Amino acid sequence: MRLLIPLVFSSFIFFGCRTSSVSSTHTPPVLLDSSTISLTAVSEDSSYGYTEKNPIQTGGGAAGERRYLNALTGPNGETVTYVRLGSCCAFKTPNGIINNTGLLDKYEVRYEGLNKSVILYLNMYDTGEMKAPVNFGYKK
């Protein structure tokens, strides 16, 4: 028993202090406030966020997705509303929880003056450069 306690303690230190095998050179997003990230540009890529092949990489889990969506406006500063529709579209990522796999989240997004709501695809596992999608603006 006397040997078991130091052995368990040592294993916590050894395994708990190892570095991640996934490296990132991406800078964490700047926040406007605790629930909104700071965006600085609108994407010129018309597929950005609108397809599962080109999702918005928010990182930060569900909170990261909400911080991103809270930063969006309509093109003329209109207030944006959104509803999570669910998850889809399994993909491989070193940041996935089970078997290096993640799922994209689909959000229905709208603002006043938009004829039809749009669906945006967000990746909460990986972080990339975030911009507002085409036909959107962002809070300043």
For each feature predicted by the language model, list its residue ranges:
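Positively charged n-region of N-terminal signal peptides that target proteins for export
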Residues: 1-4
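Sec-dependent N-terminal signal peptides
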Residues: 6-12
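C-terminal motif of bacterial Sec signal peptides marking the signal peptidase cleavage site
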Residues: 15-16
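N-terminal secretory-pathway/extracellular module detecting exported/lumenal segments
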Residues: 20-103, 113-140
